[in-house]
């Protein structure tokens, strides 16, 4: 036995030196291939402007006759710890309808073409027939680069069991965070049509996330969206920030007591061998933040409050300082009519402006979304404190879900997602992704594209009643709810999940699309993929985490690797096997 251990140790040392070169080359190759692919996509093609010009009509803030002008936003940066909050105003949001085509036939798309996600076919494939998938995110570092781990790409998703007896629209109270993996560096054209992801199962051990609510009464406990952060490059520690939620409901799904939502952290480790990816840990779950009722609305103020979706990052303008953005609502009792002229944002003497009383009379004050900010107060990211919201949407919208920070050409972009059905009375917009641009993490953020905020929406007829994803209107565009939960990735790639296409429910990953960004405007890149649609679930890493020590340990620690049995064979044969795997 001692002789075998010495053989394994010697083999480990030999592999370590060789793997350093092989894996390092793989990392450079992966990043180089990504850069070349993006350059090819951006190359000039006849009839398409390579940059600027008519490709980005959303740069215009000139306004539309019959509609108010958008609010004036400077994009000026402020101290992140100041109490300045930018506003997504009604004047801003009304630009969506202003730039919608009122003359289209019923059920057609009325949105600007460059801001419309291409049509998803109704015969879409599913990622896995035994699991519903919706909100999805990637393994990122503090700069939001997306990492593969020792040759594997990994994604994290909200999942539910389609065979458990509840319907697709009841999945939220049963949500568990699951993970999928696939080999890195393979173009979408060479993968299975559904993206080629293998389901790895639930990320957390059964019952682990419920410890946050130990001793409390609830009928359902679920895991909602967040982010997964690789804590050290060339390491395997992963910190998951997610929303731990608990519901206490009667048989008719009415709240007995308000739901609870706690932003929570848990630590684990990622592992990989020749055949699969797995995780260990995630047994201890640390509550980080609960809405305080001062900056962020809580359940005592509104049983329908929103507080979820943590996304963490280090601000390059403040090295070593970690921030978190999340979805919230403006604090205060639900139903109090206290929106202000500043929330409306109309310019002085604008002839098309609404009056404050008109807005309050419409009941728009029930919609008070915001995008929150917190700052870490320790190096382990296990202690945080609230800061003032980054953006408020009082009397505009009630949900600004899954916010993220995206840096591009020196600008700070906040992207978030929202529904048509959560807009306040008198304003309208499609299901899709909304964006805001400024000069720092706290800025007087300017809504993108005509000053509206809309970055990319589903094909929608804003002249026709919305309907719902579970009960679509026959007069509405059949793809108005085709996708949701968009996440903007490096290179402008955008992933999402399929909700409803021509009355077919999804619960699977949508085709990836690409948006091009130019200052305060964006445009869907129709040159990407096939008419603007890339591969289903094509979520590529743009960086590679090469953890040599972990790679070797995982190879010899798993019987599926096949290496343990070869410990006494020729080192060169084993090394050749490793090289072949990493260079496939």
Swiss-Prot record:
Phenotypic effect of disruption: Disruption of the gene results in a mutant lacking both levansucrase activity and the ability to utilize sucrose as a carbon source.
Q: Which residues carry this modification: Pyrrolidone carboxylic acid?
A: 31
Q: How does activity depend on pH?
A: Optimum pH is 5.0.
Q: Which GO terms describe its biological process?
A: carbohydrate utilization
Pfam families on file? Glyco_hydro_68
Q: What class of enzyme is it?
A: transferase
UniProt keyword terms in alphabetical order: Carbohydrate metabolism, Disulfide bond, Glycosyltransferase, Pyrrolidone carboxylic acid, Secreted, Signal, Transferase
Coiled coil region boundaries = none
Q: How is it modified after translation?
A: The N-terminus is blocked. The N-terminal Gln is cyclized to a pyroglutamic acid.
The UniProt-reported impact of residue 135 to N is:
2300-fold decrease in kcat for sucrose hydrolysis
Question: Matching InterPro entries, A to Z?
Answer: Glyco_hydro_68, Glyco_hydro_beta-prop_sf
The residues annotated as site (Transition state stabilizer) are 309
Q: Name one GO molecular function term.
A: levansucrase activity
Entry function = Catalyzes the synthesis of levan, a fructose polymer, by transferring the fructosyl moiety from sucrose to a growing acceptor molecule. Also displays sucrose hydrolase activity. In vitro, catalyzes transfructosylation from sucrose to a variety of acceptors including water (sucrose hydrolysis), glucose (exchange reaction), fructan (polymerase reaction) and sucrose (oligofructoside synthesis). Levansucrase of G.diazotrophicus SRT4, unlike the enzyme of B.subtilis, causes accumulation of large quantities of tri- and tetrasaccharides but small quantities of high-molecular-mass levan.
The family annotation for this protein states: Belongs to the glycosyl hydrolase 68 family.
**What is the name listed in the Swiss-Prot or TrEMBL entry for this protein?**
Levansucrase
- Naturally occurring in which organism (per UniProt): Gluconacetobacter diazotrophicus (Acetobacter diazotrophicus)
The organism's taxonomy opens as: Bacteria, Pseudomonadati, Pseudomonadota, Alphaproteobacteria, Acetobacterales
Quote the gene name from the UniProt entry. lsdA
